[in-house]
Amino acid sequence: MVDQLEDSVIETNYDEVIDTFDDMNLKPELLRGIYAYGFERPSAIQQRAIMPILGERDVLAQAQSGTGKTATFSISVLQKIDTSLKQCQALILAPTRELAQQIQKVVVALGDLMNVECHACIGGTLVRDDMAALQAGVHVVVGTPGRVHDMIQRRALPTDAVQMFVLDEADEMLSRGFKDQIYDIFQLLPPTAQVVLLSATMPQDVLEVTTKFMRDPIRILVKKDELTLEGIKQFYVAVEKEEWKLDTLCDLYETVTVTQAVIFCNTRRKVDWLTEQLTERDFTVSSMHGDMDQAQRDTLMHEFRTGSSRILITTDLLARGIDVQQVSLVINYDLPANRENYIHRIGRGGRFGRKGVSINFVTNDDVRMMREIEQFYNTHIEEMPMNIADLI
């Protein structure tokens, strides 16, 4: 029975979608902050969750990292804050110091034009510094349950003005043993505080929190095929001519130790050619493209997943279907012919919270396409540094 609950998926009970940030009636300075941060249009979770949160409903969202969830609650928090009131109006909990600091950065960046004070309360820092910052007055506190609980107990963090309580990665927090502190914090908040809970999975202890502390929540399930470039280091190598790519690839392999890599080419012919070239040079390579039947593909994927082949060469056709945990490196031997496929190729390297590296081979003819990709995703692809080995 427990196992069934472990993986239970919530059912969405809300399907209103707002397609653009402009239609969300946000404060002009917040909207400017969103665009300045590089967001162009809301991701699936942002389209669905921001409005109900702004409507002061309790919201339960099942979403993986990389779906844009941090900005979802950050935008909502910033919209609701009264900056003329120097009191903590929103409290955000996260399982780790790193995540708490990351959330703080997003809140500060999006609220750049709003004069918002956002403080990170995390372990490993001086308690007296926390107390001083909180006493100076902040609008938003983001932190780990232990330190936040401590600050409330010491009366350094008054909770009477808290209108919104956000629990990010609730499954992680509860599995790390923060249950008692979280329950205590709930008891110390005003009964009217709105609760927003985000979790990738819905195990029993998360469902318990939702039934105990949430009032008739709006439930939103975001499928995890929304990809992101967050956490992925993107580089390019300038290779003047197509003919030089093979040597560049071999040189790269001499400098880095890679557990596994996926290499994308634009044509099946090139996949076959490159496979042949690398096999001749004693690399263990598998290749996959659309001419193969499903059984062949499954065998190859199995080989790659189990690590018996370390390099998988493939075309865009399969960009969406490769979901391999250990892939730390994606190489675009050819830049994709259309921009949309770029994220499907490299957005997987950093899944499951793993960081990834992508390296793009760029000929003189590809420079324009690379700039287009950068613009389209509002991202930056840097020239590959000499110490690339340390980054993979």
From Swiss-Prot:
Keyword rRNA-binding: no
EC number(s) per entry: 3.6.4.13
Similarity-based family: Belongs to the DEAD box helicase family. eIF4A subfamily.
Annotated organism of origin: Schizosaccharomyces pombe (strain 972 / ATCC 24843) (Fission yeast)
Signal peptide, first to last residue: none
Amino-acid positions noted as binding ATP in the UniProt annotation, renumbered to this chain: 63-70
Gene: tif1
Pfam family, one: DEAD
Entry's Gene Ontology BP terms: cytoplasmic translational initiation
Boundaries of every Helicase ATP-binding domain copy: 50-220
Entries under PROSITE patterns matching the protein: DEAD_ATP_HELICASE, HELICASE_ATP_BIND_1, HELICASE_CTER, Q_MOTIF
List of residues that carry Phosphoserine: 65
Protein role: ATP-dependent RNA helicase which is a subunit of the eIF4F complex involved in cap recognition and is required for mRNA binding to ribosome. In the current model of translation initiation, eIF4A unwinds RNA secondary structures in the 5'-UTR of mRNAs which is necessary to allow efficient binding of the small ribosomal subunit, and subsequent scanning for the initiator codon.
InterPro entries: DEAD/DEAH_box_helicase_dom, EIF4A_DEADc, Helicase_ATP-bd, Helicase_C-like, P-loop_NTPase, RNA-helicase_DEAD-box_CS, RNA_helicase_DEAD_Q_motif
Name the record gives this protein: ATP-dependent RNA helicase eIF4A
Reaction catalyzed: ATP + H2O = ADP + phosphate + H(+)
Highest taxon listed in the record's lineage: Eukaryota
This protein's UniProt keywords: ATP-binding, Cytoplasm, Helicase, Hydrolase, Initiation factor, Nucleotide-binding, Phosphoprotein, Protein biosynthesis, RNA-binding
Binding partners and assembly: Component of the eIF4F complex, which composition varies with external and internal environmental conditions. It is composed of at least eIF4A, eIF4E and eIF4G.
Comment, domains: The Q motif is unique to and characteristic of the DEAD box family of RNA helicases and controls ATP binding and hydrolysis.
Motif (Q motif): 19-47
